């Protein structure tokens, strides 16, 4: 058996056992194409989730209870031979062949530090609501518009991620956006429009249930990455982006209810 190439981190509170199983199984399917280390970060009291993860071959790490960014960073700290990082939530999925596809994209050019693919938005029953596959447009909008790079469905070179210090533990919603903006200084981004992941859209998803707080945190992150001279006027475009994001979320909820 060759050394693992991809470190997949899955943080969970352990309260979604049915979808957690599906998420872990979707990662295990990737082992047909490449070697993967799956780290499940979960609290000590999540006994059933820990047992489930262990039975399915994951490495279980204790959640430090300092927020989701700190949990992911704990997973990153377990790195051994892996070159790449990928994330999956406890109700997300990696599509068959998804990690291998992302690896081929990120390895196309030596200066690439991040690769992302399309992401299916699915309802609680797994039916596709819509697909996010913005490609190059996502990179153009990143610093001022909506973040269209899906965290599930992204692969990052671990050396570059460690150079930026991992994920900011003070952030609850936009830690991926902050990392993406920092990573631009370390190399280029590449993409495929092929769906490589699925995000389960339901009312208690962290960013779905807390849309306003998520938008405000994202605006704060984007503002601090702007040139100092234009930060005071960033509200001119951040507010319309917030409105557009809320409108898109409303349409997503409507589509989910209509299925």
Q: What would you call each of these model-derived segments?
A:
Residues 40-50:
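A conserved acidic beta->alpha catalytic loop
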Residues 136-217:
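Conserved nucleotide-sugar donor-binding catalytic segment
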Residues 1-26:
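N-proximal low-complexity "stem/linker" segments adjacent to membrane-targeting elements
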Residues 24-35:
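Short, acidic, metal-binding catalytic loop of nucleotide-sugar glycosyltransferases
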Residues 93, 97-129:
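Conserved donor NDP-sugar-binding/catalytic core segment of glycosyltransferases
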Residues 63-81:
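Glycine-rich, basic loop-to-helix element that forms the pyrophosphate-binding segment
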Residues 82-93:
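Short beta-strand-to-loop acidic/aromatic patch adjacent to the donor-nucleotide binding site
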Residues 4-7, 37, 178:
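Cell-envelope/extracellular polymer assembly enzymes that use nucleotide-activated donors
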